[in-house]
Amino acid sequence: MAELTTIARPYAKAAFDIAVEHNAVDNWAEMLTFAALVSENETMKPLLTGSLASTKLAALFISVCGEQINEQGQNLIKVMAENGRLKVLPAVSELFAQYRNEWAKEVEADVVSAAELSSEQQQQISISLEKRLARKVKLNCSTDAALIAGVIIKAGDLVIDGSVRGKLSRLSEKLQS
């Protein structure tokens, strides 16, 4: 995965720079997400790693994407096809999303709770994280009954384990040492 990220980084950075320059960051995010989905399609995958000429591959890919990709996006597809890099489009899309979140001062936070959180609880977590991180927070909530009670919050490098399972694990470690 690290290798794909290394390969994808210059393409994502170039796309992001163009998107910012043309005030089209959201449009580019949608285009790259769509192109990534096309590249992951079971019919398309073998073509991306096959021996199809780069110009034909780019033309085919662009025709499949249709109106979803503008002229600048098509140019990116052509360059990536020429370099045999269309298979890294999902990583390009992911990196672009990270650049976008950083630029917009946003962070995604994964919140795992033992029981489903009410909208009020989600709002309280969001407000607390926004104060702590000085960024706009988008919550991705899920449940895991194995936590017993409480929540685990992951936002970037920050991990807050407020679950009973986590507390029991830490207590067990202290008792064993």
Swiss-Prot record:
GO terms for cellular component: plasma membrane; proton-transporting ATP synthase complex. GO terms for molecular function: proton-transporting ATP synthase activity, rotational mechanism. InterPro entries: ATP_synth_OSCP/delta_N_sf, ATPase_OSCP/d_CS, ATPase_OSCP/dsu. Gene3D superfamilies: N-terminal domain of the delta subunit of the F1F0-ATP synthase. GO terms for biological process: proton motive force-driven ATP synthesis. The keyword Cell membrane applies. It is found in: Cell inner membrane. It is a peripheral membrane protein. Keywords: ATP synthesis, Cell inner membrane, Cell membrane, CF(1), Hydrogen ion transport, Ion transport, Membrane, Transport. Signal peptide: none annotated. Pfam families: OSCP. It comes from the Bacteria. Belongs to the ATPase delta chain family. F(1)F(0) ATP synthase produces ATP from ADP in the presence of a proton or sodium gradient. F-type ATPases consist of two structural domains, F(1) containing the extramembraneous catalytic core and F(0) containing the membrane proton channel, linked together by a central stalk and a peripheral stalk. During catalysis, ATP synthesis in the catalytic domain of F(1) is coupled via a rotary mechanism of the central stalk subunits to proton translocation. This protein is part of the stalk that links CF(0) to CF(1). It either transmits conformational changes from CF(0) to CF(1) or is implicated in proton conduction. F-type ATPases have 2 components, F(1) - the catalytic core - and F(0) - the membrane proton channel. F(1) has five subunits: alpha(3), beta(3), gamma(1), delta(1), epsilon(1). F(0) has three main subunits: a(1), b(2) and c(10-14). The alpha and beta chains form an alternating ring which encloses part of the gamma chain. F(1) is attached to F(0) by a central stalk formed by the gamma and epsilon chains, while a peripheral stalk is formed by the delta and b chains. PANTHER family: ATP SYNTHASE DELTA CHAIN. HAMAP family: ATP_synth_delta_bact (MF_01416). This is ATP synthase subunit delta.
